[in-house]
């Protein structure tokens, strides 16, 4: 009787082992589907967030420090002029969008780093990926529109207006124009980094099964 009981127990174990193996394989497959990216790609995503935050803060700080006073000659008269970023709606737009993008990048960076430290997927689901993708797309378009608007104003300051006596204001206001140019450069760079993040999310969505 004892021998028969031991044989039955061994048979039950033999039957249960394949089932346990199948459950483990299913869990592993689900985890792989939820993490189509490797750790290197997730670290790259975090690095993009860091760079985007740095460039947007640089664009913001360069613009808000753009102010200068000088004199300019118009029809032979020396007139005092003062230039400040807040005098232009386009420059104010750059400041506002850069601040929002910096906050967005910081939030995504904190979320990604916390999940990396817990060794969990940076992107948890398709809905999360779609949400982040939409945010990156919207902010990328906002940054490129802000940079384009600021570029138009800056170009006018550098060239003046044809057929009028208005001069090249960037000659007496060189420091102001340099600050604005640096801000515009970082604005377009932030747009590129947001676009790169959006491409990563598209790749994640194409590889994910859930």
Swiss-Prot record:
Ranges facing Cytoplasmic side: 1-45, 114-128, 200-210
Bilayer disposition of the protein: Multi-pass membrane protein
Swiss-Prot/TrEMBL keywords: Cell membrane, Glycoprotein, Membrane, Transmembrane, Transmembrane helix
Residue stretches spanning the membrane: 46-66, 93-113, 129-149, 179-199
Ranges of the Extracellular topological domain: 67-92, 150-178
Glycoprotein recorded as keyword: yes
Cellular component per GO, a single term: plasma membrane
Chief location bin: membrane
Glycan-carrying positions: 157
Source organism superkingdom: Eukaryota
Localization per Swiss-Prot or TrEMBL: Cell membrane
InterPro entries: CASP/CASPL, CASP_dom
Alphabetized NCBIfam families for the sequence: A_tha_TIGR01569 (TIGR01569)
Subunit structure as annotated in this protein's UniProt entry: Homodimer and heterodimers.
UniProt record similarity statement: Belongs to the Casparian strip membrane proteins (CASP) family.
Protein name: CASP-like protein 3A2
Native organism: Populus trichocarpa
């Amino acid at each position: 009787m004892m021998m028969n009981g031991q044989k039955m127990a061994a048979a039950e174990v033999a039957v249960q082992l394949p089932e346990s193996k199948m459950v483990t394989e299913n869990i592993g497959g689900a985890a792989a589907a939820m993490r189509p990216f490797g750790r290197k790609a997730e670290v790259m995503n975090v690095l993009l967030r860091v760079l985007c935050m740095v460039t947007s803060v640089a664009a913001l700080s360069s613009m808000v420090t753009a102010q200068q006073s000088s004199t300019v000659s118009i029809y032979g008269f020396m007139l005092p002029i003062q230039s400040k970023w807040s005098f232009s709606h386009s420059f104010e737009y750059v400041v506002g969008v850069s601040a929002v993008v910096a906050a967005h990048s910081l939030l995504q960076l904190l979320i990604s780093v916390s999940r990396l430290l817990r060794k969990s997927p940076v992107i948890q689901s398709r809905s999360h990926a779609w949400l982040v993708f939409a945010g990156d797309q919207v902010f990328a378009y906002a940054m490129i529109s802000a940079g384009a608007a600021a570029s138009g104003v800056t170009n006018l300051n550098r060239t003046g207006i044809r057929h009028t006596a208005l001069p090249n204001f960037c000659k007496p206001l060189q420091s102001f124009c340099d600050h604005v140019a640096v801000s515009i450069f970082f604005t377009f760079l932030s747009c590129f980094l947001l676009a790169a993040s959006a491409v990563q999310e598209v790749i994640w969505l194409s590889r994910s099964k859930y």
